[in-house]
């Protein structure tokens, strides 16, 4: 699960790079939404990883 958290976090950072810097002008809103979705998925995966270890 922690591996998924890291993967989702990296995807969120890439989406933020495209969405917040204006590189992909046509897809700004989609990239911003994807950023928040993948940050949420990263947090959920992180919490699930910590709770499974106990």
From Swiss-Prot:
It holds the Pfam family DUF1328. Keywords: Cell membrane, Membrane, Transmembrane, Transmembrane helix. InterPro entries: DUF1328. It comes from the Bacteria. Signal peptide: none annotated. It is found in: Cell membrane. The chain crosses the membrane at residues 5-25, 30-50. One of its GO terms (cellular component) is plasma membrane. Disulfide bonds: none annotated. It is a multi-pass membrane protein. Belongs to the UPF0391 family. HAMAP family: UPF0391. This is UPF0391 membrane protein Daro_2080. It comes from Dechloromonas aromatica (strain RCB).
